[in-house]
Amino acid sequence: MSLLAKIVDGKNLSFEEAYELFNELKGSDGVLIGAYLAALQTKGYTGEELAGLARAMRDSAVKLDLGKVADTAGTGGDGSSTINVSTASALILSAFTRVAKHGNVSITSKSGSANVLEALGLNIRVSPERAREMVESTNFTFIFAPAYHPALRPIMPVRKALGIKTVFNVIGPLANPADPAYQVVGVNSPELLEPVAEALEFLGVERALVVHGSGMDEVSPHRETLVLEVGNGVERYTLSPEDFGIEPVKPLPCSSPEESAARIKAVLGGSGRREDRDFILVNASAALYASGVAEDFREGLEMAREALGQGMLEKLEEIACLSKS
């Protein structure tokens, strides 16, 4: 039975079969790629399948050795159209530890991490050598998925043409070629929490949080956030704004990468609206906790708050300049 027939039949793939599937996809034409993506989306995916696809994607990527790094990313596709908070929290996290932010331009939302970082002045297409230099000098680099995953080239236009969420929304945050030790992964559906956590265990992450914040692939600053913490096994719990020491506040919508960048800069500079600031802070707190920098979420939020206005805009300028040199 072919892999496609097995998926259409509703049967799950093993890690090895999922690994093989990625290698088959990268050599296929658009019709077959579309069939695979639609069939997988209809069937749903297991943690083992996600891990096999992500491992194959990492193994096919441009090699990158940055040492022990952290990453913050979401699956996108939640329809919330808020500021790009995972990018903002990654920048704050880099004030404390090394970050290799893996991301792409928008596929299913108005603004991907690459779009926002370009609007913030970064060159998003940096070589492995420049990425290492950036991490060593600033604690931050951006890993632009299309530049580091040449195997995705035949797949990207099919994803765009389909215009629906696919398995690549989910494995994108799992396929960072820098092999991060620490991660926060936001998922757009509660049903993805367990398979993504299982995949992270398969991939050998040291510590990770998989989060879904009341409809968002982020930590919510105004409602409950479901969390699966991966480390020594998997622990499930719920976070509320009170766990961070803040009053609930609803995130505001955002219409473009340029608007997102301007609002992120305002917060990094120590101003900005409370709705943006607290949204960024709770997510930065989660990243600081997942990376082992903060002992708990309240401490993480206070550490992130203290970083705002304390040279963060200058740090952003340094990152942008180094990315272009």
UniProtKB/Swiss-Prot annotation:
Single GO MF annotation: anthranilate phosphoribosyltransferase activity
Entry cofactors: Mg(2+)
Residues binding anthranilate 1, per UniProt: G74, N104
Keyword entries, A-Z: Amino-acid biosynthesis, Aromatic amino acid biosynthesis, Glycosyltransferase, Magnesium, Metal-binding, Transferase, Tryptophan biosynthesis
GO biological process: L-tryptophan biosynthetic process
Annotated positions binding Mg(2+) 2: D217, E218
Similarity comment: family membership: Belongs to the anthranilate phosphoribosyltransferase family.
Name by which UniProt lists this protein: Anthranilate phosphoribosyltransferase
Organism: Thermococcus kodakarensis (strain ATCC BAA-918 / JCM 12380 / KOD1) (Pyrococcus kodakaraensis (strain KOD1))
Organismal lineage: Archaea, Methanobacteriati, Methanobacteriota, Thermococci, Thermococcales
